[in-house]
Curated annotation (Swiss-Prot):
The keyword Cell inner membrane does not apply. Belongs to the universal ribosomal protein uS19 family. This is Small ribosomal subunit protein uS19. It comes from Alkaliphilus oremlandii (strain OhILAs) (Clostridium oremlandii (strain OhILAs)). PANTHER family: RIBOSOMAL PROTEIN S19P FAMILY MEMBER (PTHR11880), SMALL RIBOSOMAL SUBUNIT PROTEIN US19M (PTHR11880:SF8). Protein S19 forms a complex with S13 that binds strongly to the 16S ribosomal RNA. The lineage of its organism: Bacteria, Bacillati, Bacillota, Clostridia, Peptostreptococcales. Signal peptide: none annotated. Gene3D superfamilies: 30s Ribosomal Protein S19, Chain A. GO terms for cellular component: cytoplasm; small ribosomal subunit. GO terms for biological process: ribosomal small subunit assembly; translation.
Amino acid sequence: MSRSLKKGPFIHQGLLKKIEEMNAKNEKKVIKTWSRASTIFPQMIGHTIAVHDGRKHVPVYVTEDMVGHKLGEFALTRTYRGHDDNEKTTKRK
């Protein structure tokens, strides 16, 4: 279920403040954040944001196609290593 239109999109205020300060100074530094629920705004385009995935910060370079999505969508929390292929060959014998 999506967020109500009258509420508007969510963004962590500290993150928005850092982005606006960097845009005013024309700086491009990596910004660390734990706010995976923050929506990506057009002001963030061109910045690299390090999003926490539960154990480390994953750098996410924001492009125009990402606007409207959440930061957490681009920092995966689970590692998938694939299924074991050896079981298939041993069962056929």
